[in-house]
C-alpha cells in the first residue's frame, strides 16, 4: 500500500488556536470531537470540529471534570475514546497511579509551590498508568469509578498514550506505550485485547516495536493503528517531545498483535525547513469522514518547541491509502518539489506544462490515480487546471473550471490533491471556490 499524506490540503493552518496536545478524534454524526491532554483549566479538554468548515474547532470544556480519588490532577495525558455499540462511550487516559500525601499537598499550598522534597519523592515512586471512564455522551461527563489503573506495568516505567483500535469483527484493542524513558528504561509499543465492554483487558500485552532507528532517539510513543490494504499500519511518534526533532513514523504489522516491521529508515512526517511551518509533529490519530481518512496531530508553533509558554496547536491532514508499493511515502513532499519547478517556470519532468486533452482524459478516467499515475503527472493535471483558471475573465468562471476539474472522473481524492496544491500555490484567488467544491464533494 502506498501511503500519501497531503499536508495542509487547504491552507495548512491550525484548526484550533490554543494549546491542544496529544489529540484524539472521534466522528459522531455530523460532528468530530477532539480530545487532548490536560491543560490548566481541564483534565480532558474537548472541542467540536465541523468537517464541512475546514474542521474549525469550538472548545466545549472538560470532558472529565472529576477524577477518581486514587490519582492526582495535572497529569492526565493522551486520551482516547471508544464509541461502544450500545451508544455509550469509554475514555482511556494516562494518569498517576497514586496521589501524593495530603500533608505534602498542604505544604506545597502553604509555600505556594508545586514541587518540593515530598513531590520529588512522589514523582519517583508514582507511575503514569492507564485508567478508563464511561459517559453517555461524547462530550461527557466521563466518570471513572475504578479503584486503580487497569494497565500499569510499573517495572517498565508505567504506561501512557492509549489508543483504541477496533478490528473488523468488532473486537476492541488498546495500543499503548511503556513509559520507561523517565526511569532509564527502554520504551516500546504494545497492543492488548480488551473485553467486549472495553473496561478490562482480555489477554496479555504483545510487544509491537521499540526504538531501533537513529531518528527515533531513545523512545517511541503515541501509537495509533489503521487497517488498510490487507495490513495493519502502526503509526507512532518518536524522539524528544519538546524539540523540533519529534516526528511521526510508521510500521507495517501482520496482525494487531504483530509482528511489525518499519519499512522506512526516516520519519513519515517531520519538521520541515520552512520556518513558518509547525515543528515537532506528533500525537497522531485517525478518523474516517465520508469515506476519506484524516489524521489529526499536534505541532509546536514555530520557535516555541520546549519553551515555557510554548503551545502545541492542532492540525488535520488528508491521508490516502492507495498504490502498488509496499513502502509508505509522503505525497506532499514530491508534490511540493514539483510545484517548486512549476513556480520557477520549469515544466513538470516527463509531462508538458499543459498536458493535452487526451492525457487529461486518461488521468481523469483512472480508477486509481495514485496507483496508475505518478505524483508529477497528477501535479501536471493540477497545474493545467490552474493555468486554465489564469485565463478566466471572472472569478465565477474560474470556480466553474475548478468544479469541472474536480468532478470529472471517478476518484475525487485523486483530483482534489493536485488541483488543491496547484491552486493554492499558483492562483490563490480561486481558493474560496476550491474550498467550497472540496467540501461539497468530500462531505455531501
What is the predicted role of each segment?
Residues 17, 36-38, 73, 123-124, ...:
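Extracytoplasmic/periplasmic, Sec-exported soluble proteins
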Residues 36, 67, 85, 93, ...:
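Sec/Tat-exported extracytoplasmic proteins
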Residues 1-30, 346-394, 442-444:
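Extracytoplasmic low-complexity, Pro/Thr/Ser/Ala/Gly-rich segments
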Residues 1-348:
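Carbohydrate-active catalytic/glycan-binding domains of CAZyme proteins
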Residues 27-30, 189, 288, 358, ...:
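Extracytoplasmic/secreted proteins, especially bacterial periplasmic and envelope-associated proteins
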Residues 55, 200, 369, 394-395:
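A general structural signal for well-ordered secondary-structure junctions
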Residues 267-272, 279-281, 363-367, 382-384, ...:
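Short, local alpha-helical segments
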Residues 383-444:
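Extracytosolic low-complexity repeat regions of secreted or lipid-anchored proteins
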Amino acid at each position: 500500500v502506498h501511503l500519501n499524506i497531503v499536508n495542509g490540503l487547504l491552507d495548512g493552518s491550525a484548526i484550533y488556536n490554543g494549546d491542544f496536545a496529544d489529540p484524539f478524534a472521534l466522528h459522531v454524526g455530523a460532528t468530530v470531537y477532539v480530545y487532548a491532554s490536560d491543560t490548566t483549566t481541564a483534565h480532558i479538554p474537548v472541542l467540536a470540529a465541523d468537517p464541512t468548515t475546514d474542521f474549525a474547532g469550538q472548545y466545549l470544556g472538560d470532558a472529565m471534570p472529576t477524577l477518581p480519588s486514587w490519582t492526582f490532577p495535572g497529569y492526565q495525558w493522551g486520551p482516547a475514546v471508544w464509541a461502544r455499540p450500545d451508544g455509550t462511550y469509554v475514555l482511556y487516559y494516562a494518569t498517576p497511579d497514586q496521589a501524593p500525601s495530603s500533608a505534602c499537598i498542604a505544604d506545597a499550598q502553604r509555600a505556594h509551590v508545586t514541587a518540593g522534597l515530598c513531590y520529588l519523592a512522589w514523582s519517583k515512586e508514582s507511575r503514569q498508568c492507564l485508567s478508563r471512564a464511561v459517559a453517555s455522551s461524547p462530550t461527557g461527563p466521563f466518570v471513572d469509578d475504578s479503584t486503580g489503573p487497569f494497565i500499569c506495568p510499573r517495572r517498565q516505567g508505567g504506561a501512557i498514550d492509549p489508543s483504541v483500535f477496533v478490528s473488523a469483527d468488532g473486537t476492541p484493542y488498546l495500543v499503548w506505550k511503556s513509559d520507561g524513558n523517565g526511569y532509564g528504561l527502554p520504551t516500546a509499543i504494545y497492543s492488548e485485547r480488551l473485553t467486549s465492554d472495553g473496561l478490562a483487558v482480555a489477554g496479555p500485552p504483545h510487544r509491537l516495536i521499540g526504538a531501533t532507528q537513529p531518528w527515533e532517539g531513545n523512545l517511541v510513543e503515541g501509537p495509533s493503528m489503521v487497517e488498510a490494504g490487507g495490513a495493519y499500519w502502526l503509526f507512532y511518534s518518536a524522539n524528544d517531545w519538546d524539540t523540533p526533532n519529534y516526528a511521526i513514523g510508521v510500521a507495517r504489522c501482520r496482525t494487531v498483535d504483530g509482528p511489525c516491521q518499519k519499512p522506512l529508515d526516516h520519519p513519515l512526517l517531520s519538521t520541515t525547513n520552512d520556518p513558518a511551518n509547525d515543528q515537532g509533529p506528533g500525537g497522531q490519530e485517525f478518523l474516517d469522514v465520508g469515506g476519506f481518512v484524516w489524521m489529526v496531530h499536534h505541532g509546536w508553533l514555530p520557535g516555541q518547541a520546549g519553551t515555557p509558554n510554548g503551545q502545541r496547536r492542532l492540525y488535520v491532514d488528508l491521508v490516502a491509502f492507495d498504490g502498488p508499493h509496499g513502502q509508505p511515502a509522503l505525497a506532499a513532499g514530491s508534490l511540493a518539489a514539483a510545484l517548486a519547478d512549476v513556480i520557477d517556470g520549469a515544466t513538470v519532468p516527463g509531462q508538458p506544462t499543459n498536458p493535452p486533452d487526451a492525457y487529461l482524459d486518461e488521468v481523469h478516467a483512472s480508477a486509481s490515480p495514485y496507483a496508475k499515475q505518478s505524483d508529477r503527472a497528477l501535479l501536471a493535471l493540477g497545474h493545467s487546471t490552474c493555468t486554465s483558471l489564469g485565463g478566466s475573465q471572472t472569478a465565477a468562471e474560474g470556480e466553474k473550471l475548478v468544479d469541472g476539474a474536480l468532478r470529472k472522473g471517478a476518484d475525487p481524492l485523486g483530483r482534489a490533491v493536485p488541483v488543491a496544491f496547484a491552486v493554492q500555490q499558483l492562483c490563490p484567488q480561486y481558493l474560496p471556490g476550491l474550498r467550497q467544491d472540496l467540501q461539497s464533494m468530500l462531505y455531501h
